[in-house]
A protein has these predicted regions:
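Metal-dependent nucleotide-binding catalytic modules
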Residues: 1-172
Length: 172
């Protein structure tokens, strides 16, 4: 939902294939974090506690504990499952969009910004685990402004509210 809001707000033309891939990439971008949590639940919990108490990022703790961070794990899983390369790149590099070649950069930037916005709104795994940081070059390259951020945030909140209502209806 956030990736779609970012795409709609971009002042630069977002190619149709990027717009379509953004939804799937937005859903799958933290695939590696889910896998690491499933494979190493105790270590993952300890990392979250350490981040709350001492600061730092999930990626830094993942690298320290396992020598690999969740983006890379997710990218490797996506490759193994033959998920399209553009989505693999978004999963792998959503925290480092500058590492991606030009052919996938727009999608990765969209997911990077959507991830940043969702985490800072508290829609991430744990908003206290993530720094309030994003790559300003990604923001600028998509032609986004401060005013756009307010619109994106409103769209994400509205979509989240709809999701909550739908979930309540489905659970009843």
């Amino acid at each position: 939902m956030a990736a779609g809001a970012v795409c709609r707000s971009c002042k630069v033309r977002v190619p149709k294939e990027v717009y379509e891939a953004a939804y799937v990439a937005g859903l799958l971008h933290d695939l590696g974090a889910i896998a690491l949590t499933q494979w190493f639940p105790e270590e993952s919990f300890a990392a979250h506690v350490a981040i709350r108490e001492h600061g730092g990022t999930a990626s830094a703790y993942e690298l320290e504990m396992w020598g690999i961070e969740h983006g890379e794990v997710g990218g490797l899983l996506a490759e193994r499952w033959s998920i399209p390369v553009s989505i693999q790149q978004a999963i792998m590099h959503h925290h480092q969009p500058w590492l991606v070649g030009p052919e996938h950069r727009t999608l990765v930037r969209v997911i990077h910004i959507a991830d940043f916005i969702c985490n800072n709104l508290g829609f991430g795994r744990d908003e206290s685990v993530f720094p309030n940081w994003f790559d300003p070059e990604a923001w600028d390259a998509l032609g986004l402004s401060i005013e756009d951020s307010q619109s994106i945030i409103s769209q994400v909140r509205a979509a989240a509210d709809k999701s909550i209502v739908l979930t309540k209806v489905l659970v009843q």
